Amino acid sequence: MQQRRPVRRALLSVSDKAGIIEFAQALSARGVELLSTGGTARLLAEKGLPVTEVSDYTGFPEMMDGRVKTLHPKVHGGILGRRGQDDAIMEQHHIAPIDMVVVNLYLFAETVAREGCSLEDAVENIDIGGPTMVRSAAKNHKDVAIVVKSSDYDAIIKEMDANEGSLTLDTRFDLAIKAFEHTAAYDSMIANYFGSMVPAYHGESKEAAGRFPRTLNLNFIKKQDMRYGENSHQQAAFYIEENVKEASVATAQQVQGKALSYNNIADTDAALECVKAFNEPACVIVKHANPCGVAVSTSILDAYDRAYKTDPTSAFGGIIAFNRELDAETAQAIISRQFVEVIIAPSATEEALKITAAKQNVRVLTCGQWAQRVPGLDFKRVNGGLLVQDRDLGMVSEAELRVVSKRQPTEQELRDALFCWKVAKFVKSNAIVYAKENMTIGIGAGQMSRVYSAKIAGIKAADEGLEVKGSAMASDAFFPFRDGIDAAAAVGVSCVIQPGGSIRDEEVIAAADEHGIAMIFTDMRHFRH
């Protein structure tokens, strides 16, 4: 549908001033009359633009410290008036039609994110007039264009130039959708904030405030449609959070390869989150959301080589993540050695991309460097509900470890224990990881009994000819029986790191002492389901 409406009068009132001067100049140059409020009006006037204050247009001043500015029939009548149907009543009450509304809302999210923000601060940053104008204009999109995103400014001017100062109904409808999405997200933020403040408001523990609101409203933006979901009979799409700053698969830029699949995204997320746990140059190879090889070294090339050797069979068709820039030498090693679905790194050199480009099916993502892990919430959908928890960012330092065995670990055993403890956190429970000299040598994932995960890790190491004797073993949760320790001892493990906390801890510790194994408790569990 191409029904056009000329833009002759626009009302501009924005909190985010990015691009507004240039947009207003472009509108004015095309003969559009400008109405504006408060700070936006002052800014436009300072730039020499002919602008009419809304208070002058309505004959009613701003009042109550700016709480009442645009809530007036001459404003909303001009926006909501149906062209060709309400013309007589508009003329009778001297209401001029407003053809475009340019509004973005008070920065509520930024306000409540500031340290020390009080409930009163939050309340004063709840926009009333803005959402009202946005909804009015979106409702009357057949006649009015509503603009809530500065990223649309250029396209709007281009379309006006192509249509003699008019916008099509298709464009106005699309802008209306964005407007309703904008106000829905805004109201959700406010509802989430107020819901999370209920305990503090009633004088209860402040620790409960700001965490889990009474009603949870989530807003995600569709990034891409997919050919199918986890399986070919399932339809799927990928949605992302708006304004995410953390390096992630959601914010990563795809610089090469065909479109990411549902499973690509899930596995890439698992690989990237694991590699973020390491400060040294690291490589993580993931298959079906589980690490199948992890290593740290002095270079990502050596880290990749060592991670690959853990389980070359599983690495085929896997996802590879690095915490350093992908260089040409490493790219060549990967391409010449294995089939890979996705490579993700903070960045990639031009030479590396030329090499990976030779394999058109290889997807390469760059996500930018990260400073530290960002706290947030994890969600798990269950039928009829949603489980919500803090992200598992828990880590233990060497100083927090407790040696509970008779034998103390050697320095190398301690380093290996801390390394495989980091890896175990990202392996599906029940998780067992064997490691030696900063590389995994066997990973047992997702078994219903812990002892079988331990046995599988040993089998994996033996299959690849990796020496288990003198290695460390990490378990994501406590050992309910001594059998896991016996299985580890049988293949030569010399140090075990685990949370502890079983009613049979003494039995398990006794097994370690019997085998001469050093045992470390972390007092922190890392289930992953």
Swiss-Prot record:
Q: Name one GO biological process term.
A: 'de novo' IMP biosynthetic process
UniProt-listed Pfam families: AICARFT_IMPCHas (PF01808), MGS (PF02142)
Q: Which residues form a coiled coil?
A: none
Domain of life per record? Bacteria
Instruction: Cite the MGS-like domain residue spans from the record.
Output: 1-148
Q: Report the CDD domains cross-referenced here.
A: IMPCH
Name assigned to this protein:
Bifunctional purine biosynthesis protein PurH
Q: Which organism is it from?
A: Salmonella paratyphi C (strain RKS4594)
